[in-house]
């Protein structure tokens, strides 16, 4: 079974829910062994959020309805709590704690980068399971193996630089490993750490200072504006649909993040069609979804 983790459970909810319902009603459209395991993202505005800037707000009832919709259909919710600039007092943020109370469930997860939130959430909301974020930027296989061996984590998202590395097939705990299939970031991007810190601080400053979430991205990470097929062509860490359902799955690596938080909706749609839908149904499903998104 290939488990897919879809982006932006809140801002991309219409598309995510449309694909989940389509899979329920027309499973013949989908690749064999395709499973929508979880949706990831944050409710706005969560200051624990990192990597992808998130503005606006979310009513508590909306958060409850969104969580229930996914969970009632067996789809897990993953909070992307990956802000690397948090201080101890930030754990008491009212909005983030409300969202945790609403969604605390043994089938839901928190994706984190350090022990601050791991310790706080595990003691305050013990039903959550945890995912180690790729934002930790582990650069060697040994470090990845150490992370996979930690009992604190149900899953570990690998740095995309490992995707082409055949050593992945020899590591232990492959059932806990998640690979990012279509990251647009350039291989070993020297600005990635700086970008994460910038976006984390920007999230903390929401409502306090003038916001310009594109400032760093446009100056240093032009790859964020590249479309799905450019990423497919130019990134050696891109995972093709053939390899995902073929060699990776055959070697016991079955969990894949589809990138798309903050991306153009039609670019995300193209990724969904590519990874989930059988070739003979792709045009039909693409049109159905474009009409649905109008």
Q: Which ranges hold each PLM region?
A:
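Active-site pocket-lining/capping segments in soluble small-molecule metabolic enzymes
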Residues: 1-147, 153-294
């Amino acid at each position: 079974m290939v488990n897919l983790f879809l982006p932006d459970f809140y801002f991309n909810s219409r598309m995510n829910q449309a694909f989940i319902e389509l899979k329920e009603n027309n499973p013949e459209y989908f690749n064999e062994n395709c499973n929508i395991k979880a949706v990831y993202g944050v409710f706005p505005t969560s200051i624990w959020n990192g990597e992808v800037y998130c503005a606006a707000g979310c009513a508590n009832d909306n958060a409850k309805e969104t969580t229930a919709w996914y969970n009632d259909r067996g789809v897990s919710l993953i909070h992307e709590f990956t802000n690397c600039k948090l201080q101890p007092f930030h754990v008491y943020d009212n909005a983030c704690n409300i969202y945790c109370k609403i969604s605390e469930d043994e089938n839901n997860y928190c994706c984190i980068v350090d022990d601050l939130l791991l310790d706080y959430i595990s003691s305050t909301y013990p039903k959550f399971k945890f995912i180690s974020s790729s934002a930790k930027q582990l650069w060697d296989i040994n470090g990845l193996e150490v992370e996979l061996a930690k009992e604190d984590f149900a899953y570990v998202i690998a740095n995309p630089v490992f995707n082409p590395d055949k050593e992945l097939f020899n590591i232990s705990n492959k059932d806990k490993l998640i690979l990012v299939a279509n990251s647009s970031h350039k291989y070993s991007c020297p600005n990635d750490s700086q970008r994460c810190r910038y976006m984390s601080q920007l999230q903390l400053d929401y409502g306090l200072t003038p916001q310009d979430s594109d400032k760093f991205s446009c100056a240093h990470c032009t790859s964020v504006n590249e479309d799905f097929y450019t990423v497919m062509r130019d990134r050696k860490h891109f995972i093709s649909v053939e390899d995902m359902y073929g060699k990776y799955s055959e070697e016991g690596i079955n969990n894949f993040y589809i990138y798309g938080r903050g991306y153009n909706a039609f670019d995300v749609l193209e990724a969904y069609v590519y990874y989930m839908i059988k070739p003979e149904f792709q045009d039909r499903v693409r049109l159905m979804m474009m009409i649905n998104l109008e």
